[in-house]
């Protein structure tokens, strides 16, 4: 069962199973302020099932589990998108253990946010959005999963910096927190005023940043990243802006080089004949400095469907290949489609 992404190439984290596992590994928090204590009931459990023939099933699993946060009085829940990607069933569990069927409302690949809605709204108070820009180095906050105070951990912000994911994902000003929360996917980053500041995405081994000693923590997607796209995502399920070009490459940096660590089966790079272990040097004649530079140059090339020329290296031989980019959202199925 996939329970969240981590920073390695295996794609799925392996936290403890269910609420009991979280409680067993957390010390608990006492003397919570009233705003925080009241907000915790909005954190819900989320389970999804994914058909075996869906493309994400191999890497993320056919059963996924994490958290979400109730954000309105009509059952709307925000979570991290990979938990609901290609799911055909969604079940929400509230703080009292009630299981509520839900359905996918929207998923934004660029930010990573996912939205689902319960068929019947849970009888709990929703959490309001806060201002994630208020968080800076050493700011204090709480990380919460379903279960109230027993599933809550006090954390500090270890950094605010750019995060480049190997799956063609780039997030400005991501929030890194310590210590690590064991079941991070979709968990709530709650401000001291009880507002929602971020949604849990990753377990990372270098939460303190480049050049600092390795120290495990979590990466949270800032809630301010959701605000400008929220209304359209609720109304349409995805954004109407032209989709970014997508290659279907999983890229890692190794000894100063950009190396293909994996390829999406049937995606643009796969169809063009690229292989795991290939080294990327340039895109449309422009040298690639690092992964963020690669993504920015790819996305600046035009909308999805644009053809790009990659200069590659394989077994010490250089070659060029033209790849017709695709739309990631069309590669994956949406809900029960």
What role is predicted for each listed range?
Residues 1-36, 124, 150, 192, ...:
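C-terminal cap/linker of serine protease catalytic domains
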Residues 20-24, 51-53, 65, 70-152, ...:
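Conserved active-site neighborhood of the chymotrypsin/trypsin-like protease fold
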Residues 38-55, 59:
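A short, Trp-centered hydrophobic/proline-enriched beta-strand micro-motif
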Residues 43-47, 77-81, 136-147, 177, ...:
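Active-site-proximal beta-strands of protease catalytic cores
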Residues 61, 126-172, 205-211, 229-242:
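Flexible, gly/ser-rich surface segments that form the specificity/activation loops bordering the active-site cleft
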Residues 64-68, 127-132, 174-192, 265-271:
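Gly/Ser-rich catalytic serine loop of serine hydrolases
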Residues 73-78, 193-197, 269-292:
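Conserved PDZ fold ligand-binding element
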Residues 103, 231-238, 266, 272-275, ...:
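PDZ-domain C-terminal substructure recognizer with occasional recognition of PDZ-binding tails
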């Amino acid at each position: 069962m996939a329970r969240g992404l981590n920073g390695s190439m295996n794609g799925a984290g392996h936290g403890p199973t269910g609420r009991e596992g979280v409680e067993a590994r957390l010390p608990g928090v006492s003397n919570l302020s009233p705003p925080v204590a009241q907000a915790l009931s909005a954190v819900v459990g989320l389970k999804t099932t994914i058909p075996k023939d869906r493309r994400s099933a191999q890497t993320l699993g056919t059963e996924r589990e994490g958290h979400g946060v109730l954000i309105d009085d009509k059952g709307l829940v925000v979570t991290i998108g990979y938990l609901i990607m290609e799911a055909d069933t969604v079940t929400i569990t509230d703080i009292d253990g009630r299981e509520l069927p839900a359905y996918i409302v929207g998923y934004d690949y660029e930010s990573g946010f996912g939205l689902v809605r319960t068929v019947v709204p849970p009888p709990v108070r929703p959490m309001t959005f806060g201002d994630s820009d208020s968080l800076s180095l050493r700011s204090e906050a709480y990380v919460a999963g379903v279960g109230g105070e027993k599933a809550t951990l006090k954390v500090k912000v270890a950094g605010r910096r750019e995060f480049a994911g190997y799956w063609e994902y780039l997030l400005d000003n991501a929030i890194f927190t310590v210590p690590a929360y064991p079941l991070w996917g979709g968990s709530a980053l709650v401000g001291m005023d009880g507002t929602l500041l971020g949604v849990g995405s990753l377990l990372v081994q270098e939460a303190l940043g480049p050049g600092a000693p390795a120290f495990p923590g979590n990466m949270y997607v800032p809630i301010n990243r959701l605000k400008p796209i929220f209304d359209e995502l609720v109304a349409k399920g995805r954004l109407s802006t032209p989709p970014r070009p997508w290659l279907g490459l999983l890229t890692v940096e190794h000894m100063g080089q950009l190396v293909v660590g994996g390829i999406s089966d049937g995606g643009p790079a796969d169809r063009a004949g690229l292989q795991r272990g290939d080294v990327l040097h340039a895109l449309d004649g422009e040298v690639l400095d690092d992964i963020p530079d690669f993504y920015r140059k790819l996305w600046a090339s035009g909308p999805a469907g644009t053809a790009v020329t990659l200069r590659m290296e394989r077994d010490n031989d250089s070659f060029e290949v033209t790849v017709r980019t695709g739309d990631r959202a069309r590669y994956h199925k949406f809900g029960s489609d």
